[in-house]
Amino acid sequence: MRTPLILLALAAGFVLPACSRQIEPPGTPGACYHVQPTKEGLKFNRLPSAQPSLEHCAAALEAMRIRFLNMGGNQTEIAGAYQSNFLFLVSAGIYTSTSWEGARFLALVRSGDGRLVLPGAMPMSPEP
């Protein structure tokens, strides 16, 4: 008698979180956004110029981050959005995800001199 109740409770525990609504970015073509978490949720601030690709949006966000740091800011990690994808600019590179809470995938890495490049684009030095 208890087994069906336990199974029902376990099934509800797995199904209910899957039904929760995930935060998704705007899908406006060519629009690049800086995303700022607030107490009320996420605030999407559109960057002034249209960007042709996710990589260009990431570069525009990186330039914005560097400008703010040069003006005395202290925020080293920022988030953005481009055509239904979130961008997360962190020290290792730039990650992308289709939702704020979802899994993040590496889109661009930092080269030895700090530039952003596609993973595997930089030649590896030969092993000694």
Segments predicted by a language model, with ranges:
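Bacterial N-terminal signal peptides that target proteins for export
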Residues: 1-8
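C-terminal motif of bacterial Sec signal peptides marking the signal peptidase cleavage site
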Residues: 15-18
